A protein has these predicted regions:
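Negatively charged, low-complexity tracts enriched in Asp/Glu with abundant Ser/Thr
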Residues: 1-24, 61-96
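Long, continuous compositionally biased terminal/linker segments
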Residues: 33-66, 70, 74-77
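Short N-terminal "domain-start" leader segments
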Residues: 76-117, 159
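Short aromatic-glycine-(Arg/Gly/Cys) micro-motifs in beta-strand/loop hairpins
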Residues: 109-133, 168-170, 174
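A short, exposed loop/beta-hairpin motif centered on an aromatic-Gly-Thr core
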Residues: 128-140, 157
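A short, charged, amphipathic alpha-helix used as a generic interaction element across diverse proteins
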Residues: 139-151
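Amphipathic alpha-helical oligomerization segments
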Residues: 157-176
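Conserved small/polar residues in nucleotide/adenosyl-binding loops
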Residues: 178-180
Length: 180
């Protein structure tokens, strides 16, 4: 993966988070603007550089955390896409790569003009094709979670949805208040 490819994909990811990547600087760093000022700079290896005086509020710290998470995630999946084997399946357009495969379930990705996109599929009985695609577009994390559930790596019964987690949080807070 080239520096340009990484920064282009990272720029897509940052814009989706309402952060503004600026043109590359002479030193090869990608500046990221937030709230009308430069928040940090990202290196081609995915490291995030910043001056602590720039991150002086909780909102600025949250924005910096988003940049750091995006830089690491994009580096992870771009490296995977670069090294992954092509997905061979009857009737499937070229360009998809196998990021993971387990128990008849495939996590695949492809690079498009609008950035990397991800999908999970079930393999056909004879493993010559794929079907029942769950398309996650640019949501790499969502595709990974779906792969873990569909493939059986994680049992559905052990995963809480947001509503269940909120109920647990409220119950724990209620217990904390009772015992104070």
């Amino acid at each position: 993966m080239t520096k340009e490819t990484y920064f282009e994909e990272l720029s897509y990811a940052l814009r989706r988070r309402e952060l503004l990547p600026r043109p590359l600087e002479e030193d090869g760093l990608l500046p990221v603007e937030w709230n009308g000022r430069i928040l940090c700079r990202v290196t081609e290896s995915g490291a995030v550089r910043y001056d602590p005086t720039w991150v002086d509020t909780s909102r600025a710290k949250a924005a910096l955390a988003q940049v750091t998470e995006a830089a690491g995630t994009v580096m992870e999946y771009m490296t995977l896409l670069e090294n992954a084997p092509p997905l061979k399946a009857d009737g499937l357009a070229d360009g998809y790569r196998v990021l993971a495969e387990f128990n008849g379930t495939v996590l695949a990705g492809t690079e498009t003009l609008l950035g990397a996109q991800f999908v999970t599929w079930a393999r056909d009985y004879d493993r010559s094709g794929v079907n029942n695609g769950h398309y996650y577009m640019e949501d790499y994390q969502g595709a990974r979670e779906d792969f873990a559930l569909r493939s059986g790596l994680v049992a559905r019964e052990r995963v809480f949805d947001r509503e269940q987690l909120e109920g647990l949080r409220q119950a724990v807070q209620g217990l904390s208040l009772i015992h104070i």
